[in-house]
Amino acid sequence: MTEKLQNALNEQITAELWSANLYLSMSFYLEREGFSGMARWMQKQSAEETGHAYAIAGYMIKREATPKVDKVDVVPQGWGNPVEVFEHALEHEKHVSKLIDELVQVASEEKDNATQDFLWQFVREQVEDEANVLNIVSHLRKAGDCAILFMAVSYTHLTLP
């Protein structure tokens, strides 16, 4: 694995950890505001992002590369109403999709087919993640306060890893 690709993968590890912290911040905010179901959904997203960082690091180790965690920047803390929280989550998922696409491009430029293959799981997952958050945002916008109250309790059953 080239140094350029190792650096790009390490940047993605840091981005995944930042994403995990972002979702955790959203979770704490929603919990404090009394939306425990939504908070639980955000907790699950946080755990998923941490899992991505571990997956990338594990892949790098298998390829005899060195995973590194760089400084993880501070995430926002205040979010507004639940619709705004999920709108921000949607924009963030779109940003992550762009980062993954750029990472696939680096792997292609470096002629690393194994890494391209590894990364396609994240490309597919991002399509699903964006669609899921878009669906939530759409429902929240259409139903207004009723949907917010429904979601506040409907996601409390989620199991965390």
Which sequence ranges carry the predicted segments?
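C-terminal end-helix/capping segment
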Residues: H139-Y155
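Acidic/histidine-rich alpha-helical segments that form the ligand environment
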Residues: A8-A15, S19, Y23-M26, L30, ...
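Basic/polar N-terminal segments that are highly enriched at the extreme N-terminus
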Residues: M1-E3
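Conserved small/polar residues in nucleotide/adenosyl-binding loops
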Residues: T156-P161
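Residue-level recognition of alpha-helical structural elements
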Residues: L5, F35-M38, P82, K111-T115, ...
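Charged, low-complexity surface patches
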Residues: L5, S19, M38, E49, ...
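Conserved alpha-helical segments that form or flank metal/cofactor-binding pockets of metalloenzymes
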Residues: L30-K71, V133-V137
